[in-house]
Design a protein with these regions (language model features):
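Helix-loop-helix units of permease transmembrane domains in multi-pass membrane transporters
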Residues: 69-95
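Alpha-helical transmembrane segments of multipass membrane proteins
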Residues: 25, 29-33, 97-105, 145, ...
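Hydrophobic alpha-helical transmembrane segments of multi-pass membrane transport/permease proteins
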Residues: 18-38, 57-64, 167-181
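Aromatic- and glycine-rich beta-strand/loop motifs that create alpha-glucan
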Residues: 1-21
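Terminal transmembrane helical anchor/hairpin motif
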Residues: 40-41, 107-137, 162-240
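Selective transmembrane-helix segments that form parts of the transport pathway or gating/packing helices
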Residues: 15-23, 85-110
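Long, hydrophobic alpha-helical segments
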Residues: 49-71
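Secretory targeting signals
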Residues: 33-55, 96-161
Length: 240
């Protein structure tokens, strides 16, 4: 475990300054909402909410999965840290980072009860604000996005120029293609996809269950992790 601890510490020191900047950005966003929300909503209505305070954190965690991967990869290899050890250490680092951000988001939720009537995606989706559910769901969402960022970076690094262009263009091409397929099936395609997503996130029953969504996101994160490992073990050092 000592070999993992040293690599995690290496990553943690790297993330610390980025983490500080990100927390400052989220804090500034919340302070701004604290001023704007009372100005544009009826103070007499305690149930009115505007915006989601965890969007900045979600985007940042998605980016950090890609940022941490190239940082120090060649340096750690040079100092005898194997790719397998780096993979495990990175997984543990992202898990710890996701847990920390879940707690930070919960702290902002508590502060917003006093300063601004805002909410987070968990509250908007499940219409509840329990501490355990919020932290667990946010942790799973952060972890999934971190692995998505990590996977995306590695795929772009190991593919050629034409493949990179195709991957970048794919999201813009996918929309029209899905639209045509949906028209061909009289809307059945998107309805089926929508039902699958709703069920996977635990929203299909009369009482939404966030822990179904947590399980789905964790399983998906594990799937990305399983896809990441063989890529990381084979990626060329000169590309890092």
């Amino acid at each position: 475990m000592g070999r993992y601890a040293s690599v995690i510490k290496f990553y943690a020191l790297t993330v610390l300054k980025w983490q500080t900047v990100s927390i400052a950005a989220v804090l500034a966003f919340n302070v701004l909402l604290s001023v704007l929300v009372p100005a544009f909503t009826s103070i007499s209505d305690p149930h009115v909410t505007i915006g989601s305070t965890d969007v900045v954190a979600l985007v940042w965690v998605l980016a950090i999965g890609a940022i941490l991967t190239p940082y120090g990869f060649r340096f750690l290899l040079y100092h005898g840290v194997s790719r397998s050890t780096q993979f495990t250490a990175m997984c543990l680092t992202l898990a710890a980072l996701s847990a920390a951000w879940a707690v930070i988001v919960m702290a902002f939720i508590s502060a917003n009860l006093v300063f601004a009537r805002t909410s987070v995606l968990y509250q908007l989706l499940y219409n509840r604000a329990d501490v355990l559910g919020t932290i667990t769901w946010e942790f799973a969402a952060f972890l999934l996005l971190a692995f998505v960022g990590w996977f995306t970076y590695l795929v772009l690094r190991v593919t050629g120029r034409n493949a990179k262009i195709a991957l970048i263009a794919a999201p813009f091409m996918l929309g029209p293609i899905l639209g045509l397929l949906n028209m061909a099936t009289d809307g059945a395609l998107l309805r089926a996809v929508g039902r699958a997503v709703v069920a996977a996130m635990g929203l299909s029953s009369s009482v939404p269950n966030p822990y179904v969504g947590v399980l789905s996101m964790l399983v998906l994160a594990l799937a990305f992790g399983a896809a990441i490992r063989p890529i990381l073990l084979r990626v060329q050092v000169r590309e890092s």
